């Protein structure tokens, strides 16, 4: 007969701890996608698409918040325009959220659907 283990699986506990933290960051991705034409302008919105926000690693809960990097898909011809307007776009995005959510933009040249 098998003895019952004193150990419990940690998967459920880890998920319960991480879900609220991830939800705070994922709202940025969803809000960006929904408001993209307003943030970057109709002309640029047709040639670009926000892909994801990557967040810097934190070594502990006491580390200060650091803004993320917004990865944007951009068609080749529009990349120069986007790069030129990067600082203004970061200001608009951070103004939209009310805090410094984005610190940098990384452009990936690819087809936008």
Question: Regions from the language model: what does each represent?
Answer:
Residues 1-113:
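Contiguous, often N-terminal, cationic amphipathic patches that form binding interfaces
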